């Protein structure tokens, strides 16, 4: 199995665009970007890559448009996100490398007889791996010697969380589950060339969901910072993260086992590998999970040839649009979050289809108070109000989605309102 590492210091470099046979004109590409971004501000081209260009809107938002006529016109877009060509967002850079090497094809649209035409993004958090998320992670002064590759990493107060634990933390905050973990776990890290054992007793911890913020960029109190730092650190230890200052790495199996054994998620959850499924089946499994209100933890990996290691990335797919693009939360403080073509990444020069996986049926187990939608430990009329507000707005902040699935069919919808009212009338 391949160790997943999130490189934190390797920025994306801009590449010279070659001449492409049958390439779209710049004017046409600019017009396409303008249509998808709307009229919120002036649209300008900010980056060029082989086969594609990136357009940014002054009022916020960006679009990545294909240069090759045979490719889908819009490969990715964000209605309000910012595109930074120097970003070291590892998940986004993985997608960028994969899409450049993939033979493009028509998108796989959601089947209207089985799925909604679109699902708005489920994840509201814009969390990452640095402050305050890494406050409880260890300080490590040991790392592989990368100076011969021209990579020099500065000292940091605490090691970064790692992309796997960061995705786990956002995922658990979405469900606001659990209140506390199960069992304990130890990991060994290296400090001053010595092994140091870190142990977490998950049973003794309480996760302070109410003091966690969806976005920490606007400032936070010590209590708010500590609440999310504890969750991230516990996720990292539970997943047996291997830390160096280069990043934090773990395995898909470790993440899955941590979610089941230490955080009480459904024990029938599993990790699927893309080569075992045809394109339509793969994408429709994503649509099905999202249409039931469950985000999809996703993984991708590639090779960093400079360093000579396989690099893994974990992120969350939490929505899709009517054109077959899925919404991705990269776990990088909101940077480049938006809609992306994942279906195209099936064959490439590095066989990116072999290097993709997703977690299915990963949601809280049944040991929650059914109907306690607002998470106050009681089931009453306020839970009905909270559930209706969620269904109307799509805003899951403060909503215990595990408890909101009152009828137990795996979907949170209007039938759960009826089931909740029946529950109140019969108890």
Predicted regions and their residues:
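Active-site-adjacent structural segments surrounding the nucleophilic cysteine of cysteine proteases
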Residues: 50, 71-249
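Boundary at the C-terminal end of the N-terminal hydrophobic targeting segment
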Residues: 19-23
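Cys-His-centered catalytic/binding microenvironment captured across papain-like cysteine peptidases
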Residues: 24-47, 57, 63, 69-131, ...
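Residue-level detector of buried hydrophobic side-chain packing
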Residues: 163, 259, 317-319, 328, ...
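Bacterial N-terminal signal peptides
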Residues: 6-18
């Amino acid at each position: 199995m391949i160790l997943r590492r999130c490189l934190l210091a390797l920025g994306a470099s801009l590449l010279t665009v070659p001449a492409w046979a049958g390439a779209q004109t710049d004017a046409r590409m600019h017009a396409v970007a303008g249509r998808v971004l709307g009229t919120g501000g002036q649209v300008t081209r900010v980056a060029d890559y082989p086969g594609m260009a990136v357009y940014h809107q002054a009022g916020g938002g960006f679009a990545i448009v294909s240069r090759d006529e045979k490719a889908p016109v819009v490969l990715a877009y964000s209605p309000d996100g910012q595109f930074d060509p120097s970003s070291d967002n590892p998940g986004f850079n993985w997608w960028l490398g994969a899409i450049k090497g993939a033979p493009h094809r028509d998108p796989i649209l959601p089947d209207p007889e089985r799925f909604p035409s679109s699902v708005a993004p489920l994840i509201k958090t814009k969390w990452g791996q640095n402050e305050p998320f890494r406050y409880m992670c260890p300080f490590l002064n040991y790392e592989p010697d990368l100076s011969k590759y021209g990579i020099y990493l500065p000292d940091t107060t605490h090691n970064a969380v790692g992309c796997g634990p960061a995705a786990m933390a956002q995922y658990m905050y979405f469900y606001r589950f659990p209140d506390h973990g199960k069992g304990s776990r130890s990991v060994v890290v290296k400090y001053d060339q010595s092994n140091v054992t870190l142990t977490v007793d998950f049973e003794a911890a309480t996760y302070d969901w109410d003091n966690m913020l969806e976005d920490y960029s606007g400032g936070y109190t010590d209590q708010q910072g500590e609440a999310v730092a504890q969750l991230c650190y516990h996720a990292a230890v539970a997943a047996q993260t291997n830390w160096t200052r280069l990043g934090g790495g773990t395995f898909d199996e470790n993440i899955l086992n941590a979610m089941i054994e230490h955080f009480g998620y459904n024990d029938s959850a599993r990790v699927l590998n893309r080569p075992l499924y045809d394109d339509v089946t793969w994408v429709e499994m994503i649509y099905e999970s999202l249409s039931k209100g469950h985000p999809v933890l996703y993984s991708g990996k590639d090779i960093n040839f400079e360093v000579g290691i396989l690099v893994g990335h974990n992120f969350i797919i939490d929505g899709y649009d009517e054109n077959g693009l899925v919404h991705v939360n990269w776990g990088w403080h909101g940077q480049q979050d938006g809609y992306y073509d994942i279906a195209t990444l099936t064959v490439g020069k590095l066989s990116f289809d072999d290097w993709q996986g997703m977690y299915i049926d990963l949601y809280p187990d049944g040991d929650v108070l059914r109907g306690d939608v607002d998470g106050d430990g009681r089931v009453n009329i306020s839970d009905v109000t909270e559930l209706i507000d969620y269904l109307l707005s799509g805003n899951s902040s403060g909503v215990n989605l595990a408890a909101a699935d009152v009828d137990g069919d795996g979907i949170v919808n209007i039938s759960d309102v009826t089931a909740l009212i029946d529950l109140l009338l019969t108890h």
